[in-house]
Regions:
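Conserved active-site-proximal phosphate/metal-binding subdomains
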Residues: 1-117
Length: 117
């Protein structure tokens, strides 16, 4: 579920929040982060206490979200960078390496062409 949310997200779908670790980290915006950022929310605990509270709950959220629970899907979040919107599809590591290799070959051939001119 989180991977699907990442693939659909843009940089505006992220938030810096202390809700997971007690320290600021960029995460996918979700009902979880919204609740922690609301004025009525308690202050997150300092690290390492906040993860001791948050991670068991988020593990259960992820488990329920994978099972299709709508409320859990809305709560599910994970760490991301601002470039999350650049990811548009899920590729295997092998595919990424092969594409990188082909890009290198293409660049090398273009460079070689410049040297011949």
């Amino acid at each position: 579920i989180v991977k699907e949310k990442m693939l659909q997200a843009s940089s505006s779908d992220t938030v810096r929040s202390r809700s997971r670790t007690g320290k600021h980290s960029r995460q996918l915006k979700s009902s979880w982060t919204d609740a922690w950022e609301s004025e009525s929310a308690p202050e997150p605990l300092p690290m390492p206490l906040q993860p001791m509270v948050a991670e068991p709950a988020l593990a259960k959220v992820n488990q329920l979200a994978e099972g299709g629970h709508d409320g859990a899907v809305n709560l599910a979040t994970y760490w991301v960078g601002q470039g999350v919107g650049l990811m548009t599809e899920s590729l295997s590591a092998g595919t990424v390496v092969q594409e990188f290799k082909q890009d290198f070959i293409n660049a090398y051939e273009r460079f070689e062409g410049f040297l011949k001119d």
